[in-house]
């Protein structure tokens, strides 16, 4: 469903503007769709990229950002932080956002799994480390699950990902993400299963994540 919505966006517009598909949905889709996610987030890491979005949209639609029409569930709303709306597709309502990440070094690439430009894995680590600082202790622990899945499938976050997260959130960004992960892993088994079920995560996948190293940041050296 998400892929069919993404196909309606103009990839050339997004590439020219330097806009990338990111967030938890982008991560989950690459990691075998390990959890359910019905949000579509595009990140705009420069003033110019967000300006391109603001110039293209109005309260009725997304203009030239789309190459095929979408059915909107609510009007398009814009402020200095983002452009937000929701679309109806396949009987579902999907939240859609273009978020201003001005002055963030987030690498945007083409990826064979996606019909639009996406954040690379390093940029995904950066944004998830900071997201875990903002809301990591909040059930159903989406950011914790994503960090654990990324560690299990992608390995340690690159040094540049940690450096960029620290540039915006300070040197406590990794310790605070570690605390969120440790908090989740210390929950009673029933609470962890409940959180996983709320996100459509299979029990065997949860068991694999529980075996992942607790640290959100790079593993300690020898």
Residue ranges and their predicted role:
Residues 1-222:
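Compositionally biased terminal segments of proteins
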């Amino acid at each position: 469903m998400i892929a069919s919505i993404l196909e309606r966006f103009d990839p050339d517009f997004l590439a020219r503007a330097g806009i990338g598909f990111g967030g938890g949905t982008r991560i989950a889709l690459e990691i075998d769709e390990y959890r359910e996610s019905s949000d579509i987030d595009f990140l705009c890491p420069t003033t110019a990229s967000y300006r391109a979005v603001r110039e293209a949209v109005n309260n009725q639609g997304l203009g030239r950002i789309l190459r095929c029409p979408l059915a909107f569930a609510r009007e398009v709303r814009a402020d200095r932080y983002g452009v937000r709306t929701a679309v109806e597709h396949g009987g579902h309502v999907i939240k859609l956002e273009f978020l201003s990440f001005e002055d963030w070094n987030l690498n945007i690439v083409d990826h064979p799994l996606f019909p639009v430009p996406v954040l690379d894995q390093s940029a995904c680590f950066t944004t998830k480390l900071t997201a875990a600082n903002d809301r990591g202790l909040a059930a159903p622990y989406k950011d914790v699950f994503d960090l654990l899945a990324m560690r299990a499938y992608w390995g340690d976050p690159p040094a540049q990902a940690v450096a960029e997260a620290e540039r915006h959130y300070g040197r406590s960004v990794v310790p605070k993400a570690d605390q969120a992960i440790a908090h989740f892993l210390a929950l009673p088994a029933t609470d962890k299963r409940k959180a996983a079920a709320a996100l459509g995560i299979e029990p065997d996948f949860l068991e694999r994540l529980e075996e992942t190293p607790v640290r959100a940041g790079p593993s300690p050296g020898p």
